[in-house]
Amino acid sequence: MANDKEIAQTEFPHQKDLKETLQEKKPSQPSLSLLCSAPPPAYPSEQASVGYGTVLARTPTIFLQARGALFSALPPPRCRARYRWTWHQGRKKKKINRPTQQRRNL
């Protein structure tokens, strides 16, 4: 008889019992335990201007602005290759105009 009770308790619950109520799907109050355990949200706009972790410790202060903003020091990430190409062209021009110590001696 005791065996029958255990089997009755472990049976699959009825289909009505599995359906969630509207209150369970959309609770009216936030779960405070979930709020305490979750890390604070980091928004993409903050990450763009602040960077990740200790990255900013190695960069000069001109790079602290948001990337891609008006008058910002860095272009948006999708322009990085084009930006490097144009920067390199200017660097090559400066290099040609500046004579080295060897050229002066010749």
UniProtKB/Swiss-Prot annotation:
Location(s) in or outside the cell: Host cytoplasm; Host nucleus
Biased segments, Basic and acidic residues type: 1-27
The record describes its post-translational modification as: Phosphorylated by host ERK. The phosphorylation triggers a structural change that enhances keratin binding and protein stability.
**Bias category Low complexity: which stretches?**
28-37
Q: Where is this region: Disordered?
A: 1-40
Which keywords are on file for this protein? Early protein, Host cytoplasm, Host G2/M cell cycle arrest by virus, Host nucleus, Host-virus interaction, Modulation of host cell cycle by virus, Phosphoprotein
Q: Which residues form the signal peptide?
A: none
Question: Which GO biological process entries does UniProt record here?
Answer: symbiont-mediated arrest of host cell cycle during G2/M transition
Q: Which GO terms describe its cellular component?
A: host cell cytoplasm; host cell nucleus
Major site of localization recorded for this protein: host cell
Oligomer and partners = Assembles into oligomeric complexes. Interacts with host CDK1. Interacts with host SRPK1; this interaction may favor expression of late viral transcripts. Interacts with host cytokeratin components KRT8 and KRT18.
Family that this chain belongs to: Belongs to the papillomaviridae E4 protein family.
What's its job? Contributes to multiple aspects of the viral life cycle including viral genome amplification, suppression of suprabasal cell differentiation and egress of newly formed virions. Induces host cell cycle arrest at the G2 phase by associating with and preventing the nuclear entry of host CDK1/cyclin B1 complexes. Inhibits cellular DNA replication by preventing loading of host replication licensing proteins MCM2 and MCM7 onto chromatin. Within the cytoplasm, associates with host kinase SRPK1, a splicing factor regulator, and inhibits its activity.
Note in the entry: The major E4 form is first synthesized as an E1^E4 fusion protein from spliced E1^E4 transcripts, such that the first few amino acids of the E4 protein are derived from the N terminus of E1.
UniProt protein name: Probable protein E4
Q: Which gene encodes it?
A: E4
